Amino acid sequence: MAKRLIMMMLRNILYLPYAFINLLRYAKNDKISEEKKYKLIRLIGNRGCKCGNVNVHGYGLENLPKESGYIMYPNHQGLFDVMGFVHLNPTPFSVVIKKEAYNVFMLRQIIQTMGGLFMDREDPREGLKVINEVANQVKSGRNFLIFPEGTRSKNGNRLGEFKSGSFKAATKAKCPIVPMAIIDCYLPFDTNSIRKVDVQIHVLPPIPYEEYQGMKTAEIADIVKERIEKVIAENEHNFEN
């Protein structure tokens, strides 16, 4: 992680103060529009990808619902996951992330500017509050990204257990579920290298509420995981990294 992150920072040495100052300004300022905040986040994401020698290949973006108020559920490979999707996606979204990220320089301000929420995975009561908050915001038209594994997989493109509780936000909001398959996004920060890498983000067809209505969240988790695994198996050898 160190080499590529250092390269990103060195190549953005003149831009970093501007970005950080604006993140501090935007993070908790409700008077600044969501679109303006997200424009800053995308600029940071775009510069990070370009200066970090990371090619992000996006597929299926047309599958994102035209109407806001949905939740995206990707597999989780590391810190680059969100940056990669920000780089691809022109539509603002928020993210639920583990509370440990709150202490990471700039990451806290980025998540706050996105309207994201920090979750304590060890506190079920707080977790339920976050799930309810996500559901309420999605009902109001905000889009969210939730990692159903809860933590990143440490086995490359192999998936960990999908926590059924993460899908309670969707069942409460009665919103479309958008599965996403992330491939090789662990490479930018998990390998001690600055060579060019190609990562893939596949947006799968959404699952409308009518399709999963009445299902248990464990069943929904299994369906989403199965669809993501299928796409990864079909595409993980598309590039030579």
Spans of features found by a protein language model:
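Generic preference for hydrophobic
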Residues: 58, 72, 95-96, 116, ...
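Short, basic, glycine/proline-bearing loop/turn elements
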Residues: 45, 116-120, 151-152
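Short gly/ser/thr-rich secondary-structure transition/capping motifs
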Residues: 51-59, 126-128, 183-185
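Hydrophobic alpha-helical segments typical of transmembrane helices
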Residues: 44, 81-84, 97, 106, ...
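Membrane-anchoring hydrophobic helices of lipid-metabolizing enzymes
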Residues: 1-70
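Catalytic core of membrane glycerolipid acyltransferases/transacylases, capturing the structured
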Residues: 19-25, 37, 51-52, 66-124
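Non-catalytic C-terminal accessory region of glycerolipid acyltransferases
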Residues: 2, 128-241
